[in-house]
Design a protein with these regions (language model features):
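Short, Lys/Arg-enriched N-terminal segments with co-localized hydrophobic residues
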Residues: 3-19, 242
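Acidic-glycine-rich active-site phosphate/pyrophosphate-binding loop
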Residues: 14-25, 56-60
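Conserved phosphate/anionic-ligand binding catalytic regions in large, soluble enzymes, centered on
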Residues: 30-48
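Beta-strand segments within the central parallel beta-sheet cores of soluble alpha/beta enzyme folds
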Residues: 59-68
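A structural-propensity feature for long, helix-poor, extended segments
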Residues: 67-102, 106
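Short glycine/threonine-rich loop-to-helix capping motif typified by GTGT followed
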Residues: 73-79, 123, 209-213
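C-terminal edge-of-domain segments
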Residues: 105, 110-138
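A conserved regulatory-domain signal marking ACT and ACT-like small-molecule sensing domains
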Residues: 113-116, 140-244
Length: 244
């Protein structure tokens, strides 16, 4: 990473007011991985892996819009191979990561990389434009913020905040009274503790997106009950990436 981007990343961390006392030594050193950079390799693989989880179907084509230092160094630092490895479901320490481009081609997945400017975002940011096996299009915007840590900021244009450090439930639902309360009650009744919850809506009475980070995984039965709540249109489940 160039000195310019290192300085820029330091300033961004300060702006985010990250509590350095809560960042451990392994967050600083980064995870076990294949490749030269925790931000450009491990973080990139995690971004791709979460995007695959969001789609939750075979992906037949993906375009990576690369911003900032991703745009400048994606070949030399292996970001291209790491992103594709994530789309294939690989973890940062998977030895097959180096061959991910060839593996994707063999599996019939069309891959394209487009350097671009995504505006006022973190320098290690990528937008993934994906098409699944049913020809449904998906967009995921995320950043690798250092030490292998990541943030997903948008899914299909909806604002979210996903770190991948905890199991996460995302609901896309109608903005009607009682929906959030009913979902929260399901967590309470099943003794599932909520670590963090965020809710955004496009406008009053229209579409809303809720992101809930929880302390434990949820069963398929609970997910089915959430899907059955009046007004819920889609439920996305992201299990913790943990060390991977």
């Amino acid at each position: 990473m160039s000195k310019h981007y290192e300085i820029q990343e330091i300033f961004l961390l300060k702006e985010r007011k990250i509590d350095m006392a809560n960042i451990g030594v392994f967050d600083v050193l980064g995870p076990i991985m294949i490749g030269p950079s925790s931000s450009h390799t491990a973080g990139a693989a995690r971004l791709g892996k979460i995007a695959k989880t969001v789609v939750n179907k075979p992906i037949k084509e993906v375009t990576f819009l690369l911003h900032g230092s991703f745009r400048e160094t994606y070949k030399g630092h292996g970001t291209d191979r790491a992103l594709v490895a994530g789309i294939l479901g690989m973890s940062p320490d998977d030895p097959r990561l180096k061959e991910s481009l060839a593996i994707a081609e063999a599996e019939g997945i069309a891959v394209k990389f487009l350097p671009t400017d995504l505006g006022q975002v973190h320098p290690n940011t990528v937008k993934l434009l994906m098409t699944d096996c049913d020809d449904i299009r998906w967009e995921v915007l995320g950043s690798s913020i250092g030490g292998g840590m990541i943030e997903i900021n948008e899914i299909n244009g909806n604002k979210v905040k996903i770190t991948g450090e905890s199991p996460t439930i995302i609901t896309c639902h109608d903005d009607i009274p009682g929906t959030v309360s009913k979902i929260s009650t399901l967590f309470y009744e099943n003794e599932i503790n909520i670590a963090r919850m965020t809710l955004v809506r496009s406008q009053k009475g229209k579409d809303a997106t809720m992101t809930v980070e929880i302390d434990s995984k949820v069963s398929d039965d609970i997910v089915a009950k959430i899907k059955a709540v009046d007004g819920v249109n889609r439920v996305i489940v992201i299990n913790s990436l943990g060390g991977n």
